[in-house]
A protein has these predicted regions:
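Iron-sulfur-associated redox domains of electron-transfer enzymes in respiratory
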Residues: 1-219
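Alpha-helix boundary/capping residues
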Residues: 16, 104, 236, 337-340
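Active-site-flanking alpha-helical
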Residues: 100, 247-251, 325
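Ferredoxin-type iron-sulfur electron-transfer modules in oxidoreductases and energy-metabolism complexes
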Residues: 211-234, 252-341
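Basic (Lys/Arg-enriched) interaction patch that binds polyanionic ligands
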Residues: 233-253
Length: 341
């Protein structure tokens, strides 16, 4: 195990950025989101949750898939280049690390999404344990340990800096790259104390009593026609804020854009909460807010576990708890349906 001081952290980040793209929490106008490192970036490793998750690193909000050009009556198709160089994602919280596993189930199942797969192959994830969990956190509900982040490299906040531990071969290679800024040290006691403090705080969170009894594999018939869906969905605005801030939502649309010199076919995030989501000539899209609202939460808590060995499509990050203008989030749904211990 190694230690990196707060004073040396900027040098370490600069060293990484010199060798590869570096994606990390950056503050801009008081708002912290993941962005690319630059020399004048206001790096923020203290804010617990970025407004948006680091999902963009592997599943961008918008990306070109291929382009079509026509010259002299000849049409050419040029696929977008796949990621072929290593890059690092720094300061990822344990819930967001688990979210990558959820996305893997979607994009790496056969036939694998080549764009996502290339990014996953070359991406190096450096996680950071949650020194001070917030009231909106409920990751423990889904079996996530905020004190034990799973990634290529795991970090914990300790006195005067951070403990650093490589967990995978990719993590070890990154460690070798920045070894000049690390001090090898036995931090077992300090890290264990930090883990215990984090777990104690998590147990005190307002949503630590959530129970998933009645959800999960095989619960479709039990939950689908529950009259509470109507009561809950009546307050939903269908704004889609929850889906765009969620680290596990994977819905997207594919569109064509005429540049005047050719056509780009691109993929962009979409929301199952929108009335025109998956709209087709046959009219198969869900026509009511009740249907759309139910679909979102049934997918996360029933359908996804049904098809993915019991894995839920929620990681308890709490972003929807904080962002929904109606305070109508997955915690409220679970509780209203009886999900408390």
């Amino acid at each position: 195990m190694y230690q990196i001081s707060r004073e040396k952290m900027p040098e370490l980040l600069a060293a990484v950025a010199k060798e590869m793209d570096l994606f990390l929490p950056v503050q801009n106008n008081g708002i912290t989101n993941f962005g690319f490192w630059t020399e004048d970036a206001d790096v923020d490793l203290d804010t617990l949750k970025t407004v948006k998750s680091p999902k963009d690193a592997f599943f961008p909000q918008s990306e070109i898939l291929y382009s079509c050009y026509q010259k002299a009556n000849k049409t050419s198709i040029e696929p977008a280049a796949l990621k072929d160089a290593p890059f690092a994602i720094f300061g990822v919280r344990p819930c967001d690390v688990r979210a990558f596993d959820v996305l893997d189930r979607v994009f790496l199942s056969e036939p694998a999404d080549v764009y996502y797969a290339a990014r996953r192959e070359h991406g190096i994830v450096v996680s950071l344990a949650c020194h001070e969990p917030e009231d909106s956190c409920f990751c423990k509900t889904f079996g996530i340990d905020a004190a034990e982040p799973a990634a290529d490299v795991a970090m914990w906040q300790v006195a005067d800096g951070y403990a650093w531990e490589a967990k995978t071969e990719k993590g070890q290679k990154l460690t070798e790259l920045v070894k000049a800024y690390l001090t090898e040290q036995d931090l077992t006691k300090e890290v264990e104390a930090e883990k215990e403090a984090i777990r104690t705080l998590i147990d005190k969170m307002p949503n630590s009593n959530l129970s998933l009894e009645g959800w999960g594999v095989g619960k479709t018939k039990e939950r689908f026609d529950d009259p509470k869906w109507k009561e809950l969905s009546d307050a939903c605005l269908g704004c889609g804020t929850c889906t765009f801030s969620c680290p596990t939502c994977q819905c997207y649309d594919i569109k064509d854009f005429n540049t005047g010199h050719g056509v780009h076919r691109y993929r962009c995030w979409d929301s199952c909460m929108y009335s025109d989501f998956t709209m087709m000539a046959a009219g198969n899209n869900r026509t009511t807010q009740l249907q759309r609202f139910r679909q979102r939460f049934m997918h996360k808590l029933v359908y996804f576990p049904d098809n993915n060995d019991g894995m839920y499509s929620c990681v308890g990050c709490g972003r929807c708890v904080e962002k929904c203008p109606q305070s109508l989030n997955i915690v409220k749904v679970i509780k209203r349906m009886g999900g408390t211990k």
